[in-house]
Regions:
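Serine-esterase "nucleophile elbow" of acetyl-processing enzymes
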Residues: 1-52, 58-60
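Alpha-helical cap/lid subdomain in secreted, periplasmic
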Residues: 54-166
């Protein structure tokens, strides 16, 4: 591979305040002497990771590029902003993003009758994984995905098992 593409949360970025100056995709790109494009952003969630990855690959040459995706927490909920929040951080894009955390909004969520917080998060996470995996497979883009933050897929729900085992 000549190029490495990386996307995720802060665990795929340097974090100098924490004394962390390297990250997985940086180490791999240096080891392989490959160009690195990194769209990872601290505190962001999986919707942004999936969508911005597909936008980048549609705007750039897919050939000779290996994708590394470090999934964020399924309890980080991204939304597109209309205020230009941190505009310009990702070249060639107009969208800007913010994130709210499920566990910071439990009072609101509990007011919604029957909202199953954990199963909702698991469903969204599985959907993000399979959506991006399908995109990579369809476009013949080699990739690896892993949980940069913990996510619970050990749920015995028939619907989830159907998707996980497909």
């Amino acid at each position: 591979m000549q190029k490495i593409f990386s996307n995720g949360c802060s665990f795929l970025t340097p974090r100098p305040k924490d004394g962390v100056h390297t990250f997985v995709s940086d180490i791999i790109s240096k080891k392989l002497n490959s160009e690195l494009t990194n769209l990872a952003m601290g505190g962001r969630g999986n919707n942004r990771i999936s969508f911005s990855t597909k936008v980048w690959f549609e705007q750039n040459n897919k050939e000779n590029t290996f994708a590394i995706i470090g999934w964020s927490s399924s309890h980080r909920n991204d939304y597109v902003t209309n205020d230009g929040w941190k505009k310009g951080r990702v070249p060639q894009t107009d969208l800007t993003w913010r994130t709210w955390k499920t566990l910071d909004n439990v009072t609101f969520i509990r007011q919604k009758q029957g909202w199953d917080i954990e199963n909702h998060a698991t469903m969204n996470f599985l959907d993000n994984i399979f959506d991006l995996q399908n995109y990579f497979e369809r476009n013949k883009i080699p990739y690896v995905m892993y949980n940069a933050l913990p996510n619970n897929l050990n749920v015995d729900v028939h619907d989830f098992n159907v998707i996980k085992n497909s």
